[in-house]
Structures are given as C-alpha cells and as structure tokens.
Design a protein with these regions (language model features):
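Conserved active-site motif detector
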Residues: 1-146
C-alpha cells in the first residue's frame, strides 16, 4: 500500500499553535449516480467535496458528496461497512479535516447492487496526528491509499 503525503507547516507565533497538516489520496467511488443524475453530470477531473451528513435518515454516518452545496452522491460503505463511517469520524473529529474529491472516470455499474457509481480520488487532509489514525484503519481492500 503506497502512501502519498504532503505536509504544510503553519508558522508558530505567540498566540497561534503550530499545526502540521498532512494529506493522502484514496481511490474510491461516488455512489448514487443513478439517483442524482438529473442534477449532476460528472466530468473527468471535476472537483467536488465530501461533507458529513449526520441527519441522513438512511445512514447516520453518511458522507455526502456535494457540488455547489447540493448533494450529488455519497461515499460508499465499503465491503466491511467501515469506509464512509471512518471518513465520517475523521471529518467530525478533525477541525482541519477536509475531503476534496476529483472525478476520474465515467459512471459505471460495478455489479455490487449499489447502482451506478463514479470513480474518483478522495484527497483527504487534516492534522498529522489524525491522519496517522486514519491510515491505521483497515477500511476495505478495494479502497487503497495512493
């Protein structure tokens, strides 16, 4: 599992603590395209973002994928049900946590019962300590850190 990291240091002043922000890329899919296709047509290299959706009536650990503040899909649960939940907890716990998403292909049906899904790369960033915890999670075999 190859990891790609970038770090930025925010310089310390008397009143501002030093925060080390690290990022990693994860290959994934945006699920629910068949539901949201009337409001979103994904294009390769398009940028969208992930945002927690704790009031989702179907999944209280849902991570919505949004474009212009509108839901256009969700992150998948993953084969062991922990993928979206792990990202949800990370985004909720880390005040510097972000999930930027880049579309990498056209919608496909993977034959897993989740309908049409859009291939993407999640650009996850946050505090170095929180990213270390995220890296240690065994979310699923099909979602790999780059």
């Amino acid at each position: 599992m190859a990891l790609k990291f970038m770090e930025k240091n925010i310089k310390d002043t008397e009143d501002i603590p030093i925060v080390v922000v690290t990022s990693a890329d994860i290959v994934s899919y945006i699920k629910g395209y068949h539901i949201y296709k009337s409001v979103w047509t994904p294009t390769v290299q398009e940028h969208v973002y992930g945002e927690i959706e704790p009031d989702n009536p179907v999944d209280k650990y849902a991570v919505a994928v949004k474009k212009d503040k509108k839901v256009v899909g969700h992150l998948p649960l993953g084969e062991n049900g922990k993928f979206a939940k792990t990202i949800f907890y990370f985004l909720r716990a880390d005040p510097y946590g972000k999930c930027d998403i880049t579309v990498t292909g056209k919608a496909v049906n993977l034959g897993d019962g989740d309908g049409m899904q859009v291939p993407c790369i999640l650009h996850i960033s946050g505090q170095k300590s929180m990213m270390e915890i995220l890296k240690q999670q065994k979310m699923t075999k099909e979602f790999k850190f780059l």
